C-alpha cells in the first residue's frame, strides 16, 4: 500500500508512526490469526481447515458472544477445526493491528471494521465483500432494519460492505415520578424540552444528567438539530467547506441548544468531569430527571422500568423547522467485514447460516436488538418490546460527527464545545471558531 494511504489510516485512527510500529501486540487475547489468511486456514490439499476472525471485542462483548456460538456450531456441522479468534479490546491497538493486516494483505476471513478510512483501504486491496449483494443472495436484505442498513452505506459508492453487530438505538430516559410531581409530559420539541428543564430547575431538581467528560455526549446535543433537519448534509458540507456554522440554520440551532443547557444550569454540577460510568450511576442511582441513554442500558434500567419509575422519549423536533421522520438515533455498532480473497463456498454457506440464526444469538445469548426485523422471542425484558416501535419503521440512520471529522478538527471542536457549554463563549463565537477550524486544518 502506498504511504499516502497509510498516512490517511493513521490520521483516521489518531495514531503516530511509532504507535504503528510498537503497538501491534498490545491488548490482544485469544489465538493469533497471523500470517497469510489462505495459509492459516487451508490444508496442503487446499481445502479449508478453519475460519479465522479478528474482533475489536472482549469475551464479554455481545458481538463475540454471538459470533462465537455461530462460528463454533457451524464449524462443528461442517467438520472444520474450531474457529480461530483474535480479540483486541482497545480501540487504538485494534486499529493498529487491522492496519497491519491491510497493509500486508493478510486479512483473516472475518474482521471488525469501521465504515470509513479502514473499510475504504480494505476495498482498495480487494479485501472486503459486498454485504448488500450477499444479503440479496440469501434473501435477507429486505428483512434488515432499513436504518441499520443505511448506517453502513459507503459514502463513495452507496454499497454496504459491513454487517452490523446489532441494532443500537438511543433515546432519553426520564423519571416518571418527578415528571408527575410537576405535571410534566415527555417533550416532543426542543422548546418543550427546555421548558421542562426550567420547571425542574426552578423546583430544585437536576433536569439533565450528562457525561460531559465524554466528548461524544456533549457533541450529541450539538448535532441533534443538524441531524433532524439535514441528516448528514450539514456535516458533510461543513467538511467540504460548502457550509458554515455561522450561516447554517441547523448548526446554529445545535450551538444554541448546548449553550442554553450548559449556561442555564440544566446539567448536573461538575458535568465536565463526569464520565459515562459515573453519569450512569448518578441517574440510575436516583439523581436527575432525564438522561440520554440507549438500548445498551436496558439491563441497568430494567428494575426501575418494571416498577413504573422510568419512561422514555425520542429526540425532540426542532421547533418551526422541517424535521425528518426518524427521531431515534440508530446505528449498527462496529461493522463486521468478510475478506473477499478468502470468501469461498464455505464462507458463503456461513454467511447464509449467520443471517438465518443471527436474531437467535442477539436475543437469546447477547440480549441486544437484532439488526433483522425478525419476531422477538418471548421472555425478554419488557423494555425490548416497548422500545421496538421507536425504530421498527425507521429508514434513516444516525450520523455521528466524531467519525466524520478529521482528527484535528474534531479535537478543536471538542475543546470549543466545552467552552460553549460553560458559557465561556457565546454561540456566535463558537460558530466563528468552528468555521475557522475546518479551513485551518485543510491547509
Predicted features by range, described:
Residues 199-200, 240-271:
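Glycine-centered hinge/linker elements that transmit conformational signals in sensory
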Amino acid at each position: 500500500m502506498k504511504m499516502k494511504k497509510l498516512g490517511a489510516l493513521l490520521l483516521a485512527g489518531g495514531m503516530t508512526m511509532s504507535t504503528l510500529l510498537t503497538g501491534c501486540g498490545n491488548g490482544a487475547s485469544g489465538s493469533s490469526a497471523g500470517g497469510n489468511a489462505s495459509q492459516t486456514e487451508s490444508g496442503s490439499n487446499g481445502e479449508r481447515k478453519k475460519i479465522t476472525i479478528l474482533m475489536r471485542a472482549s469475551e464479554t462483548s455481545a458481538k463475540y458472544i454471538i459470533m462465537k456460538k455461530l462460528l463454533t456450531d457451524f464449524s462443528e456441522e461442517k467438520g472444520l477445526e474450531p474457529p480461530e479468534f483474535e480479540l483486541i479490546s482497545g480501540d487504538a491497538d485494534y486499529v493498529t493491528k487491522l492496519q497491519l493486516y491491510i497493509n500486508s494483505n493478510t486479512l483473516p476471513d472475518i474482521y471488525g471494521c469501521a465504515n470509513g478510512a479502514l473499510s475504504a483501504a480494505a476495498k482498495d486491496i480487494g479485501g472486503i465483500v459486498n454485504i448488500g449483494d450477499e444479503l440479496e443472495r440469501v434473501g435477507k436484505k429486505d428483512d434488515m432494519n432499513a436504518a441499520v442498513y443505511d448506517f453502513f452505506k459507503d459514502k463513495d459508492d452507496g454499497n454496504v460492505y459491513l454487517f452490523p453487530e446489532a441494532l443500537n438505538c438511543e433515546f432519553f430516559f426520564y423519571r416518571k415520578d418527578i415528571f408527575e410531581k410537576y405535571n410534566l409530559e415527555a417533550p416532543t420539541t426542543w422548546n418543550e424540552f427546555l421548558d421542562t428543564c426550567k420547571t425542574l430547575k426552578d423546583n430544585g431538581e437536576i433536569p439533565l444528567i450528562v457525561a460531559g467528560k465524554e466528548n461524544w455526549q456533549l457533541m450529541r446535543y450539538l448535532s441533534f438539530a443538524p441531524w433532524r433537519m439535514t441528516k448528514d448534509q450539514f456535516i458533510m458540507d461543513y467538511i467540504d467547506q460548502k457550509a458554515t456554522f455561522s450561516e447554517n440554520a441547523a448548526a446554529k440551532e445545535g450551538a444554541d441548544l448546548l449553550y442554553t443547557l450548559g449556561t442555564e444550569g440544566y446539567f448536573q454540577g461538575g458535568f465536565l468531569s463526569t464520565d459515562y460510568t459515573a453519569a450512569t450511576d448518578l441517574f440510575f442511582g436516583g439523581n436527575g430527571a432525564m438522561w440520554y441513554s440507549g438500548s445498551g442500558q436496558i439491563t441497568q434500567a430494567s428494575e426501575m422500568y418494571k416498577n413504573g419509575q422510568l419512561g422514555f422519549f425520542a429526540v425532540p423536533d426542532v421547533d418551526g423547522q422541517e424535521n425528518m421522520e426518524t427521531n431515534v438515533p440508530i446505528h449498527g455498532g462496529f461493522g463486521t467485514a468478510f475478506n473477499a480473497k478468502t470468501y469461498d463456498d464455505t464462507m458463503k454457506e456461513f454467511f447464509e447460516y449467520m443471517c438465518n440464526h443471527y436474531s437467535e444469538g442477539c436475543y437469546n445469548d447477547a440480549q441486544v436488538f437484532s439488526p433483522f426485523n425478525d419476531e422477538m422471542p418471548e421472555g425478554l425484558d419488557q423494555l425490548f418490546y416497548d422500545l421496538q416501535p421507536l425504530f421498527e419503521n425507521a429508514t434513516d440512520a444516525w450520523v455521528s460527527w466524531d467519525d466524520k471529522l478529521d482528527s484535528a478538527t474534531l479535537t478543536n471542536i471538542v475543546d470549543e464545545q466545552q467552552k460553549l457549554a460553560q458559557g465561556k463563549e457565546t454561540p456566535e463565537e463558537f460558530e466563528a471558531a468552528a468555521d475557522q477550524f475546518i479551513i485551518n486544518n485543510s491547509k
